[in-house]
From Swiss-Prot:
Pathway: Lipid metabolism; phospholipid metabolism. NCBIfam families: glycerol-3-phosphate 1-O-acyltransferase PlsY. It is an enzyme of class 2 (transferase). The chain crosses the membrane at residues 3-23, 51-71, 85-105, 116-136, 137-157, 158-178. It comes from the Bacteria. It is found in: Cell inner membrane. This is Glycerol-3-phosphate acyltransferase. GO terms for molecular function: acyl-phosphate glycerol-3-phosphate acyltransferase activity. PANTHER family: GLYCEROL-3-PHOSPHATE ACYLTRANSFERASE-RELATED, INNER MEMBRANE PROTEIN YGIH. Keywords: Cell inner membrane, Cell membrane, Lipid biosynthesis, Lipid metabolism, Membrane, Phospholipid biosynthesis, Phospholipid metabolism, Transferase, Transmembrane, Transmembrane helix. Catalyzes the transfer of an acyl group from acyl-phosphate (acyl-PO(4)) to glycerol-3-phosphate (G3P) to form lysophosphatidic acid (LPA). This enzyme utilizes acyl-phosphate as fatty acyl donor, but not acyl-CoA or acyl-ACP. Its main location: membrane. The gene is plsY.
């Protein structure tokens, strides 16, 4: 029962869409109404407000980190261990993808997934982040960087810790993240994907 409560709390935390909240605070257009229509930091950046984009990125990453950090530090006292951590990791990620507070229309989960990985293990999160940065710098495609980082994340976890239930959670997040980028994959193949820094109206 405690595991379910932690997972439910994680889902609700994940359901807070910082792209929408931050945009409202800055009196910007709803990110679901322009560009890629994705409520995420990259699309908020297309508004031209870098501060709002950075706050969105930090907020989405922080909620993933917070949910996993809470269950890792307080879960054992309530009988919630590795299986619970894996469930919470998935729950907060699902909350971002399909948020109950925003009619189940959420983002693609890149920043939230990174927050989850950093909370699981700093080296795991750092390796995944470096992968994203290298690809983003080399090709200037945020989506391509996210896809490659997502593919490598389960391998990084496996190298660090071997096969366990949390690896399954990381793999599930990676698969969902790739799925959420289906349109981006099509655009990349067609040469129509927007590069970092461009303003797609």
């Amino acid at each position: 029962m405690n595991t379910v409560l932690f997972a439910l709390g994680a889902y609700l935390i994940g359901s807070i869409s910082f792209a929408v909240v931050v945009s409202k605070c800055f009196r910007l257009a709803d990110p679901r109404s322009y560009g890629s229509k994705n409520p995420g930091a990259t699309n908020v950046l297309r508004s031209g407000n870098k501060k709002a984009a950075i706050l969105t990125l930090l907020g989405d990453g922080a909620k993933g980190f917070l949910a996993v950090w809470l269950v890792k530090h307080f879960g054992p006292g309530y009988g919630v261990h590795e299986n619970g951590v894996a469930l919470v990791a998935i729950a907060v990620f699902l909350g971002h993808l399909w948020p109950v507070f925003f009619r189940f229309v959420g983002g693609k989960g890149v920043a939230t997934a990174l927050g989850v990985l950093l909370a699981l293990n700093g080296w795991l999160g750092l390796a995944t982040l470096v992968t994203w940065l290298v690809i983003a710098y080399a090709f200037r495609y945020s989506s391509l960087a996210a896809l490659i980082a997502a593919i490598f994340a389960p391998f990084y976890y496996g190298l660090l810790f071997g096969p366990d239930v949390i690896l399954l959670a990381v793999l599930a997040m990676s698969i969902l993240l790739v799925y959420r980028h289906s349109k981006n994959i099509g655009n990349l193949l067609a040469g129509k994907e927007s590069r970092l820094g461009s303003k797609k109206k």
